[in-house]
């Protein structure tokens, strides 16, 4: 393999040297020097692009002498640099090898994952701090947005009314986070003990998300909420009196934001606040887009003129009049849509009043939030990519449990992303130690939810795993399978529940399971279908129909037709005496007489003997 690659690099080096010397290459020359197994057009285009990037033009046919003379300034003075040619050849050879290696998604994923370097403890802390910084910037932006404070206060009121848990609103305080040196010093011992527990508790299905959180001190939360509410009321009062740009209003708004950022909010509430700000910014931009459309598309105002004059005039209701007074060729058209533009500006003014901010402040706050989110997302991405190998190592332990390996990796990656979001480096643990629990939880829960054809609830999966573990222990202890009574006593559960769990734990069997050595028959062939008529009944009914037709053929046509209509033989339904009478244009009584006469004939031994065998005689 190494010799092949060396020869390949040598060929490509000669090709590049030739191209640098003569200033061009043909597609035929490039194709002759590429590996035979390289057939992907996109990969070939990439290679030709790299050759073009070296200043070597690739032509269908060799250019004539005049063309070369015209391009002499670009091509004739090149010097063949062996080192450059070798480097380029190595790069192209690597590209070829990469292209022809494999298209297996698992191998491609592993190869790409292996290019990311592992993090040191210091690297983990650095990334965790960047995540914190990004999230802090997001919360600072939310704190500067008055409606965020209003929503936080309303959510706390719902908590006081018993409609929210405290941890659904506030989970802690950002200004009370301290370094715990004692925890940091015991990292190694704690990590080892956690890994040991991890190995022992392999069948458990964790549910840390549903576990009750300890949460912050309710009295401290109430005190801070009271301070926030007081400052916010003061802000609203000053805003109503002086407007958004007064120094006193800005000062109080900053005080409100300073208290707001001390709260460590729950993730759902943070997402709600972010969505609220984004919706408000979208509303502002929507009104601006409508004005832009009216001015540039309807009134045909030049876009540059609009942008130049519109800046800082979004809420200036005199802007349209000022633009019309410029007496441009689009002024009359602008006058026709003046009311529409003014209506959009008035809507923007209303948004300012609702938000207690200027439009410029709203946009700046949104810019701060987007920047913080991008910063945190980038750091989270780095942390996730650096720990993908941890997911692989854990997922390997859960193969052959009902999910494919790639599915296990995907579920483990979801757990890894949750771990990144919840990781607190100040507690002193290594990230891999903390993430292991989240990855295991995600994988085991996915196996419980998806591995079985018939889904079993997670709590029942836990019971089944416990039952299997105790059954194995008792099998080793007694040398035989444990009875339901013994399992019930060991697990401290009723015997009927043990039997129910054992019944649920059974795996479904495919109806296509072959039976016997020849495998011509399947399990489904031996299962009775109560909805299908048995072959015996089918044969009996067919014979009965044929016999009845033969017997009726011995009657007169009129008698046979009356019986057929009265009993629905070979018809969709039976008929009443009156319906049959109308058919024959006789009275009901006459039809009854014909029917009675025909039945007497059928009771004659010569005819009844043929039908008597079909009667069910007990």
From Swiss-Prot:
Sigma factors are initiation factors that promote the attachment of RNA polymerase to specific initiation sites and are then released. This sigma factor is the primary sigma factor during exponential growth. Residues 383-453 are annotated as: Sigma-70 factor domain-2. GO terms for biological process: DNA-templated transcription initiation. GO terms for cellular component: cytoplasm. Pfam families: Sigma70_ner, Sigma70_r1_1, Sigma70_r1_2, Sigma70_r2, Sigma70_r3, Sigma70_r4. NCBIfam families: PRK05658.1, RpoD_Cterm, sigma70-ECF. A motif (Interaction with polymerase core subunit RpoC) lies at residues 407-410. SUPFAM superfamilies: Sigma2 domain of RNA polymerase sigma factors, Sigma3 and sigma4 domains of RNA polymerase sigma factors. Residues 551-604 are annotated as: Sigma-70 factor domain-4. Residues 577-596 bind DNA. PANTHER family: RNA POLYMERASE SIGMA FACTOR RPO, RNA POLYMERASE SIGMA FACTOR RPOD. Its main location: cytoplasm. This is RNA polymerase sigma factor RpoD. Gene3D superfamilies: RNA Polymerase Primary Sigma Factor, Sigma-70 factor, region 1.1, Winged helix-like DNA-binding domain superfamily/Winged helix DNA-binding domain.
């Amino acid at each position: 393999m190494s010799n092949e690659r060396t020869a390949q690099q040598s060929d490509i080096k000669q090709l590049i040297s030739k191209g640098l010397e003569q200033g061009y290459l043909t597609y035929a020359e490039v194709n002759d020097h590429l590996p035979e197994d390289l057939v992907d057009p996109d990969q070939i285009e990439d290679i030709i692009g790299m050759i073009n990037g070296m200043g070597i033009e690739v032509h269908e046919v060799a250019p004539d002498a005049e063309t070369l003379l015209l391009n002499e300034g670009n091509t004739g003075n090149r010097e063949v640099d062996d080192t450059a040619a070798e480097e380029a050849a190595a790069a192209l050879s690597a590209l070829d090898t990469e292209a022809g290696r494999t298209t297996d998604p698992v191998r491609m994923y592993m190869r790409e994952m292996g290019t990311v370097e592992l993090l040191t403890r210091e690297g983990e802390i650095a990334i965790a701090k960047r995540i914190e910084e990004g999230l802090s910037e997001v919360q600072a932006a939310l704190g500067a947005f008055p409606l965020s404070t209003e929503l936080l206060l309303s959510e706390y009121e719902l908590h006081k009314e018993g409609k929210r848990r405290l941890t659904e609103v506030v989970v802690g305080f950002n200004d009370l986070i301290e370094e715990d040196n004692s925890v940091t010093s015991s990292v190694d011992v704690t990590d080892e003990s956690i890994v040991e527990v991890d190995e022992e508790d392999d069948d458990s299905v964790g549910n840390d998300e549903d576990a009750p959180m300890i949460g912050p001190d309710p009295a401290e939360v109430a005190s801070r909420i009271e301070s926030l509410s007081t400052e916010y009321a003061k802000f609203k009062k000053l805003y109503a009196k002086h407007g958004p740009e007064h120094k006193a209003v800005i000062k109080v708004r900053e005080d409100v934001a300073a208290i707001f950022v001390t709260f460590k909010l729950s993730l759902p509430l943070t997402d709600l606040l972010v969505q609220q700000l984004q919706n408000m910014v979208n509303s502002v931009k929507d009104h601006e887009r409508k004005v832009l459309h009216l001015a540039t598309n309807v009134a045909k105002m030049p876009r540059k003129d609009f942008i130049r004059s519109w800046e800082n005039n979004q809420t200036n209701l005199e802007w349209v009049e000022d633009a019309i007074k410029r007496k441009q060729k689009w002024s009359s058209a602008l006058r026709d849509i003046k009311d529409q533009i003014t209506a959009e500006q008035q809507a923007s003014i209303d948004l300012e009043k609702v938000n207690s901010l200027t439009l410029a402040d709203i946009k700046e706050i949104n810019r701060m939030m987007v920047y913080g989110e991008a910063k945190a997302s980038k750091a989270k991405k780095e942390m996730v990519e650096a720990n993908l190998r941890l997911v692989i190592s854990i997922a390997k332990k859960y193969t052959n449990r009902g999910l494919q390996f790639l599915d296990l990796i995907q579920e483990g990656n979801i757990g890894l992303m949750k771990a990144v979001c919840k990781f607190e480096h100040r507690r002193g643990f290594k990230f891999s130690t903390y993430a292991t629990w989240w990855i295991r939880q995600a994988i085991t829960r996915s196996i419980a939810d998806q591995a079985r054809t018939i889904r079993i609830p997670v709590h029942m999966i836990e019971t089944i795993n416990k039952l299997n573990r105790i059954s194995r222990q008792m099998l080793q202890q007694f040398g035989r399978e444990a009875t339901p009574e013994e399992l019930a006593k060991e697990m401290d559960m009723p015997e009927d529940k043990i039997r129910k769990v054992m019944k649920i734990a059974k795996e479904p069997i495919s109806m296509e399971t072959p039976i016997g050595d020849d495998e011509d028959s399947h399990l489904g062939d031996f299962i009775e279908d109560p909805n299908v008529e048995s072959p015996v009944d089918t044969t009996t009914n067919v014979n009965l129909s044929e016999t009845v037709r033969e017997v009726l053929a011995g009657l007169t046509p009129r008698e046979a037709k009356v019986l057929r209509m009265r009993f629905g033989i070979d018809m969709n339904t039976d008929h009443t005496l009156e319906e049959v009478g109308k058919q024959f244009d006789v009275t009901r009584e006459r039809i009854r007489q014909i029917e009675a006469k025909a039945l007497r004939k059928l009771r004659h031994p010569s005819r009844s003997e043929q039908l008597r065998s079909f009667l069910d005689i007990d």
